[in-house]
Curated annotation (Swiss-Prot):
Organism of this sequence: Bos taurus (Bovine)
Keyword Nucleotidyltransferase included in the entry's annotation: no
Segments of skewed composition (Pro residues): 1-13, 36-65
BP term (GO), one: intrinsic apoptotic signaling pathway in response to DNA damage by p53 class mediator
Task performed by this protein: Acts as an important p53/TP53-apoptotic effector. Regulates TNF-alpha-mediated apoptosis in a p53/TP53-dependent manner.
Binding site for Zn(2+): 142, 145, 194, 197
Primary location class: membrane
Name of the protein described by the UniProt record: Cell death-inducing p53-target protein 1
Family that this chain belongs to: Belongs to the CDIP1/LITAF family.
């Protein structure tokens, strides 16, 4: 038999610990990050590269070949390549004073109106104002025959004649004296008619 000592038992005290051979055991749920090595002759980019700087939305990035439009003092945009002609320009909304053609102003005795005829020429027509119909004939234009006339008047018994007749009866005037107001034209109503076409125009009442 040989005198060599027996080989050490794998589980004996002289066996190296598992931690000494393979290091610390990995922690469950955690994996070591994979580090990619660059190929020979190339270097990794710096790690502090971030997103491009932020610019406010009101100032867009100009593109190559783009010419910004011209902005006037009042805030209006003008297309590129357009320039106003030189010379003084009045501000917007300003109208220089100057002589203007006379308009259709009303003259004495009536008011005027401008009427366009089919030929396109402007014609001034004078329209008479409303006349005051009273106890005397009036010069006017007949609304029926459209002629300049002087009205024809006639007298008719009206309300004022009856009121004066009842007043005479109340004061004791009998024996037909109450009919005296009906015989006076100054107390009667006045009717205006056209002497040409005999059409009725207006009735002037002494007492409404």
């Amino acid at each position: 038999m040989s005198n060599d000592p027996p080989p050490p038992y794998p589980g004996g005290p002289t066996a190296p610990l598992l931690e000494e051979k393979s290091g610390a055991p990995p922690t469950p749920g955690r994996t070591s990050p994979a580090v990619m090595q660059p190929p020979p002759g190339m270097s990794l980019p710096p790690a502090d590269i971030g997103p491009p700087p932020y610019e406010p939305p009101g100032h867009p990035m100009p593109q190559p070949g783009f010419i910004p439009p011209h902005v006037n003092a009042d805030g209006t945009y003008m297309p590129s390549g357009f320039y106003p002609p030189p010379g003084p320009h009045p501000p917007m909304g300003y109208y220089p004073p100057g002589p203007y053609p006379p308009g259709p102003y009303a003259g004495p005795g009536g008011h005027t109106a401008t009427v366009l005829v089919p030929s396109g020429a402007a014609t001034t027509v004078t329209v008479l104002q409303g006349e005051i119909f009273e106890g005397a004939p009036v010069q006017t234009v007949c609304p029926h025959c459209q002629q300049a006339i002087t009205t024809k008047i006639s007298y008719e018994i009206g309300l004022m004649n009856f009121v004066l007749g009842f007043f005479c009866c109340f004061m004791g005037c009998d024996l037909g004296c109450c009919l005296i107001p009906c015989l006076i034209n100054d107390f009667k109503d006045v009717t205006h008619t056209c002497p040409s076409c005999k059409a009725y125009i207006y009735t002037y009442k002494r007492l409404c």
